[in-house]
Amino acid sequence: MSDFLPFSRPAMGAEELAAVKTVLDSGWITTGPKNQELEAEFCRLTGNQYAVAVSSATAGMHIALMALGIGEGDEVITPSMTWVSTLNMIVLLGANPVMVDVDRDTLMVTPEHIEAAITPQTKAIIPVHYAGAPADLDAIYALGERYGIPVIEDAAHATGTSYKGRHIGARGTAIFSFHAIKNITCAEGGIVVTDNPQFADKLRSLKFHGLGVDAWDRQSGGRAPQAEVLAPGYKYNLPDLNAAIALAQLQKLDALNARRAAIAAQYHQAMADLPFQPLSLPAWEHIHAWHLFIIRVDETRCGITRDALMASLKTKGIGTGLHFRAAHTQKYYRERFPTLTLPDTEWNSERICSLPLFPDMTESDFDRVITALHQIAGQ
């Protein structure tokens, strides 16, 4: 229908169009100077020394795990309440994903669950900053240091998120997403931040065929026209067309996230009169990026299932999302780990629903969602 309200919509404007035109007019549209500019600006945001732009956050996770040497027989701890790409990358490297439970009310992986899963084979811990809020990094990094295990932060939801006064990523290595529904987007893309120069060099090589330089380096840096493969790599570089859009979005991040926060505050106020349960906020000091606004739809409390609610909202022209169906309940992982039970993850996986939330959402759009929820709840 023409008046369908999507669950998310990218906030694009004249700045993004101008940025794309500049790149097209330059004659250099693949990885080049806009990538370098994006990496520098993102380091200013997070406080890291190095950033490596990639074609997606999934690509970033893949090469980050490779750069750590993750392989056959290794174990990587991650929540099941995450997008399946993390699990897929672990498996495709021959390693074993060790999925752990989350806090029932925040959906954050807990240090207690992480520590209980550590074995001599554990080679990485991947906490997820869920929905725009931060995980408890002090406790998680303390575990990593105690056991000598690297931490890779899944920050796909966390552009603009801070933990105890520092932007996510500032503690070590984190992977951000520029996917179409994220707080800033360039359609598809991602970026990895780190303070380790050797790790950053490995990422740069792995993202571009295993070469020591990319096409722009060879064109502009006076390097030999034929670079040498240092180790087999992938084609995960980000075109400058995408980087230019991401740069334009990054310049608007504060305003975009402020609008998201305002809508989230309205949702919280409205939920006081509705049976649907929002996620709880983390107890530690933080700034929430409000990537998602999630409610839990418990049939006993609400008189309707989550799936029925989503279907009903769809008939009213309102889109919703599911973030996420727990990874261990999906076919491949269900069959690979048939005895795995994660009670709080499973309870939420059956009940969570993401409501529309995006910067260009109007007051009329918001009222429409709340009116529909009241109608469905029989109020």
Curated annotation (Swiss-Prot):
Keywords: Aminotransferase, Antibiotic resistance, Lipid A biosynthesis, Lipid biosynthesis, Lipid metabolism, Lipopolysaccharide biosynthesis, Pyridoxal phosphate, Transferase
Subunit structure: Homodimer.
A Pfam family it matches: DegT_DnrJ_EryC1
Source taxon at top rank: Bacteria
Pathway: Nucleotide-sugar biosynthesis; UDP-4-deoxy-4-formamido-beta-L-arabinose biosynthesis; UDP-4-deoxy-4-formamido-beta-L-arabinose from UDP-alpha-D-glucuronate: step 2/3; Bacterial outer membrane biogenesis; lipopolysaccharide biosynthesis
Swiss-Prot/TrEMBL catalytic activity: UDP-4-amino-4-deoxy-beta-L-arabinose + 2-oxoglutarate = UDP-beta-L-threo-pentopyranos-4-ulose + L-glutamate
InterPro entries per UniProt: ArnB_NH2Trfase, DegT/StrS_aminotransferase, PyrdxlP-dep_Trfase, PyrdxlP-dep_Trfase_major, PyrdxlP-dep_Trfase_small
Organism: Salmonella schwarzengrund (strain CVM19633)
SUPFAM superfamilies given in the database record: PLP-dependent transferases
Higher taxonomy: Bacteria, Pseudomonadati, Pseudomonadota, Gammaproteobacteria, Enterobacterales
GO CC aspect terms: membrane
Job description of the protein: Catalyzes the conversion of UDP-4-keto-arabinose (UDP-Ara4O) to UDP-4-amino-4-deoxy-L-arabinose (UDP-L-Ara4N). The modified arabinose is attached to lipid A and is required for resistance to polymyxin and cationic antimicrobial peptides.
Protein name: UDP-4-amino-4-deoxy-L-arabinose--oxoglutarate aminotransferase
Gene Ontology annotations of biological process type: lipid A biosynthetic process; lipopolysaccharide biosynthetic process; response to antibiotic
Protein family according to the UniProt entry: Belongs to the DegT/DnrJ/EryC1 family. ArnB subfamily.
Principal EC category: transferase
Gene Ontology MF, one: UDP-4-amino-4-deoxy-L-arabinose aminotransferase
Residues bearing PTM N6-(pyridoxal phosphate)lysine: 182
Cofactor(s) for this UniProt protein: pyridoxal 5'-phosphate
Enzyme Commission number(s) of this protein: 2.6.1.87
